[in-house]
Design a protein with these regions (language model features):
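Auxiliary, metal-adjacent structural segments of Zn-dependent hydrolase domains
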Residues: 1-44, 62-73
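Small-residue-rich helix-interface/hinge motifs
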Residues: 34-94
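Metalloprotease/metallohydrolase-associated module, dominated by Zn2+-dependent proteases
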Residues: 79-183
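Residues that define the transmembrane beta-barrel architecture of outer-membrane proteins
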Residues: 234-239, 264-270, 294-300, 332-342, ...
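Transmembrane beta-strand segments that form the barrel wall of outer-membrane beta-barrel proteins
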Residues: 250-263, 280-293, 314-326, 352-362
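Outer-membrane beta-barrel "beta-signal"
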Residues: 272-274, 303, 344, 365-379
Length: 379
């Protein structure tokens, strides 16, 4: 999941002091500096964001290139490029659910990383300085989403089109993520070629300006920007990854939570993550509220994490979900479709090595971090 683990463990070793407060301060300052530097490098936050975009395209055998691999320090625009117009036409016209997800997959990837790091800090007692990354990743998404409907993006898109000229391979696959996402939500059947000719006269005009959005689409985008502030509601973000709930003769019981607002191919998922640890078990629960334009749907999730077996050498994790989501991932329907997901992962300790096997199966539906919207079994 990016550089979260290695970066934090190294910082922990380098910043040890006699004062606990000073130790925490130095560790988080060092982590913040590293995260800022790594933003424009492979395996950093920006790279991860673009790779989740690319994963959706790769799912449909579309080639692309992540410009974060070129170390673009200081650039305001970093692209996923070398994507042909023909491939975007194919994706939009034949796999419209994937096309809508493509636009917001980078946003999904960053919150998926945050959730994974929060789980590791909570259940594995890692005590890693992740707070700077949590805030940096969360706030970049909040600011990006809230600015997407502003008129300033009209100027930026005009400048980008002029700079890229007739070279199709130099163009980003979509431009502003969220304007293209919301336009595709409100007009799912609009042919991709209806975007018209690129201002240079070569290729399709890929980028959607805020000024091109309908009034309803622009209002919806603003609403999602306001809801995105829900992502800061977690004690993880203020330095309390574990809260002691009670102590017994058997040991301590801990809990924590996180609220998430995630964008989806049909609208959004507003969910509450519950972290719970007993002396012998690690539990994770989530309550999902899926929303399209006018209807709400619901889901439940539960997981047992790293259950120790065979003298603690075998670790077993299971996860299950059940949900109702909009039928066919539609933004407009009020008809629900029932779905489910189940996964199991087992690892065995051989010295310092922990080889593992994992299987995940799901029905049709959207699950954060799973690239497949249709039914699938992954190994």
């Amino acid at each position: 999941k990016g550089l979260g683990g290695p970066r934090a463990r190294g910082i922990n070793k380098l910043t040890k002091t006699k004062s606990e407060f000073t130790d925490i301060l130095f560790r988080n300052l060092a982590a913040a500096g590293f995260d800022l530097f790594a933003f424009y490098t492979p395996l950093g936050i920006g790279w991860l964001h673009e790779e989740y975009h690319r994963a959706v395209m790769t799912r449909r055998k579309i080639n692309s290139f992540n410009d974060m691999n070129t170390f673009p320090f200081g650039q305001s625009l970093v692209y996923v490029r070398k994507v042909t117009d023909e491939n975007l036409i194919m994706l939009s016209d034949n796999y419209n659910n994937d096309f809508r997800r493509l636009m917001i997959a980078g946003n999904e990837g960053q919150f998926h990383q945050i959730q994974t790091m929060q789980k590791n800090n909570f259940y594995l007692n890692q005590d890693l300085p992740n707070i700077p990354l949590y805030w940096m990743s969360t706030m970049t998404n909040i600011i990006y989403l809230n600015q997407s409907g502003d008129d300033i993006f009209n100027e930026r898109i005009d400048e980008a089109n002029a700079k890229e000229g007739t070279d199709i391979s130099s163009r980003d696959f979509t431009g502003a993520d969220f304007t293209t996402w919301v336009d595709a939500l409100f007009f799912p059947d609009k042919p991709y070629t209806d975007r018209g000719l690129h201002p240079s006269g070569v290729g399709i005009n890929r980028y959607i300006k805020p000024s091109q959005l309908s009034g309803e689409a622009r209002s919806y985008l603003k609403k999602q920007g306001n809801l995105h502030w829900l992502n800061i509601l977690s004690p993880h973000l203020v330095g309390f990854p574990k809260i002691k709930l009670k102590s017994t003769e058997n040991g301590n019981y801990y809990g924590s939570f996180a609220v998430r607002h995630l964008l989806t191919p049909f609208g959004n998922d507003i969910n509450l993550d519950i972290f719970y640890q007993t002396p012998k078990h690690n539990f994770f629960f989530a309550f999902h509220n899926y929303n399209n334009l006018n209807s709400s749907f619901f889901g439940l999730e539960g997981a047992l994490i790293d259950k120790k077996l065979l003298d603690d050498k075998l670790l077993l994790s299971t996860r299950a979900m059940i949900w109702t989501q909009p039928k066919n991932q539609s933004f407009f329907t009020n008809i629900a479709s029932i779905g489910a997901m189940f996964s199991i992962c087992s690892s065995y300790a051989i010295g310092h090595w922990h080889p593992y096997i994992a299987i995940e199966g799901k029905t049709n539906g959207w699950v954060m971090g799973n690239v497949f919207l249709e039914k699938n079994i992954s190994f």
